[in-house]
Amino acid sequence: MSDSQPCSTPSTRGKSDSGYIPGDDTWTQWRNIFAILTGQMTDEGKEQFRIARDIRNEAADCKRCEDQRDYLLQYSPIIRFLSDNIRQLRGDLSSHNIYCRRCTSRKAGGFDPEYGILLCANEMKDQGHLEDTMAHEMVHAYDHLRFKVDWTDNLRHAACTEIRASSLSGECRWAREFFRRGQWKFTQQHQECVRRRAILSVRARPGCKDEAHAEKVVNEVWDSCFRDTRPFDEIYR
């Protein structure tokens, strides 16, 4: 969980070559937004603007994340189902080990067998996005308990659990891909989304040489892992 951060205060230095102007007042924020819209801010400046915004909104983002997390744990069918199945494997995921934090890397969340689930509050778009992210990480938790996943050295294990998490969580359903990610295909959309996300995840692991290596590993386990819908009877959504 090293990429989650406590509260801090953005710099108050003057405008840099990136086009970003530090400051929390409304006028400065509008100047920055205008610079982005008119192409006067570099990618570096946009990243500085994003980080400052996330720091400024951290308390509100985390509070909203925690409220939605607690609601989903109580009322979401998919989250409750996964929680029950994890509990049957003598695991426990609840508000005490599902953490809402500001993350410094661009990701939605993560699972650690020792600590639990991290939800990146500053990356959550809405409650549906949070539900998909929780379900994704809970599938990882289920796999860790059910299949004894080797997270460190076995890329095939990593590829398999990523295939299952992307397929079963709902994050690759057609509406999510169509409206959120601009993927316009109607045929084989679900499979292509799952494969794409699994390759990206494997590619980011230290033991992976390159994208071709990641694709090879995903292809090796694809058939068996994509068909395995446990603990569901079928792909839920």
UniProtKB/Swiss-Prot annotation:
Residue sites binding a divalent metal cation per the record: 136, 140
Topology class, membrane: Peripheral membrane protein
Any Pfam family hit: Peptidase_M76
Coiled coil start-end: none
Residue ranges, compositional bias (Polar residues): 1-13
Ranges where the record places region Disordered: 1-23
Keyword Transmembrane: no
UniProt keyword list: Hydrolase, Membrane, Metal-binding, Metalloprotease, Mitochondrion, Mitochondrion inner membrane, Protease
Any GO BP: mitochondrial protein processing
EC number, UniProt record: 3.4.24.-
GO cellular component, one term: mitochondrial inner membrane
Localization (cell): Mitochondrion inner membrane
InterPro entries found in the cross-reference section: Peptidase_M76_ATP23
Location of the active site: 137
Metal-binding among keywords: yes
Top EC class for this record: hydrolase
One GO molecular-function entry: metal ion binding
Role, per record: Has a dual role in the assembly of mitochondrial ATPase. Acts as a protease that removes N-terminal residues of mitochondrial ATPase CF(0) subunit 6 at the intermembrane space side. Also involved in the correct assembly of the membrane-embedded ATPase CF(0) particle, probably mediating association of subunit 6 with the subunit 9 ring.
Family: Belongs to the peptidase M76 family.
Name this polypeptide is given: Mitochondrial inner membrane protease atp23
Gene coding for it: atp23
